[in-house]
């Protein structure tokens, strides 16, 4: 029986999710269609309701609707609750369920490059993207997890929810780290946060949650210019999609060849 899935967001034309999920479907021999839905700021909640009334099996949610999707759901996973946002929806026993697979997607992609246990990790930015990855990063048992933000107040809001983290402003960064994660939106506008020289002198591994299929993101290029190994978030996109696919279809697809295919576009 043909299963129906979609991703909703605004904008949505650029989304790679249909390509990724169709490749998962071919690999696992599951018949499905996966569409793009342009979100309507006024009618978003009705769009979600209509999708499932029309026998939709699962829905991915992207910017700017993750918080609204979270608020709609009656039942949420623990990681979804801690993230305060949802990117994966499905119906079960006539109730809307929500998950957030971004964090586990990041962890799985990072595992290709380094072990997180006992590492010093710096997250740049204290917005929704940062909040969504803190819990899974803490589960990996790093030595230290620091969130840096332009304004300290916003970072302190995260610290109240996650007391295990330390917070600082960009201006006060002085120490070295094993891993730096850019969770700001600066790369989307081609800008970077210029870090103090001593922060990059230890040559940390650098990861940008943003991605660009055609070229390096601004943060990745900045880190490489500083002599650091750096990658963007395309692998995270594929891994979070795999987790959503597993939630809906109870089959975990493999991701390596799909990631290689997307990189070679």
UniProtKB/Swiss-Prot annotation:
Keywords: Amino-acid biosynthesis, Aromatic amino acid biosynthesis, NADP, Oxidoreductase. Shikimate binds at residues 15-17, 62, 87, 102, 211. GO terms for molecular function: NADP binding; shikimate 3-dehydrogenase (NADP+) activity. It holds the Pfam family SDH_C. InterPro entries: Aminoacid_DH-like_N_sf, NAD(P)-bd_dom_sf, SDH_C, Shikimate_DH, Shikimate_DH-bd_N, Shikimate_DH_fam, Shikm_DH/Glu-tRNA_Rdtase. GO terms for cellular component: cytosol. Its EC number is 1.1.1.25. Pathway: Metabolic intermediate biosynthesis; chorismate biosynthesis; chorismate from D-erythrose 4-phosphate and phosphoenolpyruvate: step 4/7. It comes from the Bacteria. It catalyses: shikimate + NADP(+) = 3-dehydroshikimate + NADPH + H(+). The keyword Amino-acid biosynthesis applies. NADP(+) binds at residues 125-129, 149-154, 209, 233. Disulfide bonds: none annotated. GO terms for biological process: amino acid biosynthetic process; aromatic amino acid family biosynthetic process; chorismate biosynthetic process; shikimate metabolic process. It is an enzyme of class 1 (oxidoreductase). The active site is at 66 (proton acceptor). PANTHER family: BIFUNCTIONAL 3-DEHYDROQUINATE DEHYDRATASE_SHIKIMATE DEHYDROGENASE, CHLOROPLASTIC, SHIKIMATE DEHYDROGENASE. Belongs to the shikimate dehydrogenase family. Involved in the biosynthesis of the chorismate, which leads to the biosynthesis of aromatic amino acids. Catalyzes the reversible NADPH linked reduction of 3-dehydroshikimate (DHSA) to yield shikimate (SA). Homodimer. NCBIfam families: aroE, PRK00258.1-2. This is Shikimate dehydrogenase (NADP(+)). It comes from Legionella pneumophila subsp. pneumophila (strain Philadelphia 1 / ATCC 33152 / DSM 7513). The lineage of its organism: Bacteria, Pseudomonadati, Pseudomonadota, Gammaproteobacteria, Legionellales.
């Amino acid at each position: 029986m043909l299963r129906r899935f979609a991703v909703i967001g605004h904008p949505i034309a650029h989304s790679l999710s249909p390509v990724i999920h169709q490749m998962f479907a071919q690999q696992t021999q599951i018949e499905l269609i996966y569409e793009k839905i342009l979100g309507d700021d006024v009618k978003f909640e009705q769009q979600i309701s209509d999708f499932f009334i029309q026998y939709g099996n699962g829905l991915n949610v992207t910017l700017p609707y993750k918080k609204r999707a979270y608020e709609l759901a009656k039942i949420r996973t623990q990681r979804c609750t801690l993230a305060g946002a949802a990117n994966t929806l499905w119906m079960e026993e006539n109730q809307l369920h929500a998950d957030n697979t971004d964090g586990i997607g990041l962890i799985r992609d990072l595992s290709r490059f380094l072990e997180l246990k006992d590492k010093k990790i710096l997250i740049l930015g204290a917005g929704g993207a940062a909040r969504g990855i803190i819990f899974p990063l803490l589960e990996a048992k790093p030595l230290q997890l620091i969130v840096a933000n332009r304004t300290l107040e916003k970072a302190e809001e995260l610290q109240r929810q996650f007391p295990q983290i330390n917070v600082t402003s960009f201006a006060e960064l002085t120490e070295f780290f094993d891993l730096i994660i850019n969770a700001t939106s600066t790369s989307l506008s081609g800008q970077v946060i210029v870090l103090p020289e001593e922060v990059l002198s230890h040559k940390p591994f650098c990861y940008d949650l943003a991605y660009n299929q055609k070229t390096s993101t601004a943060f990745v290029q900045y880190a490489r210019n500083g002599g650091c190994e750096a990658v963007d978030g395309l692998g995270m996109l594929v891994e979070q999609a795999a987790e959503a696919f597993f939630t809906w279809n109870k089959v975990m697809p493999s991701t390596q060849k799909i990631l290689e295919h997307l990189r070679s576009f």
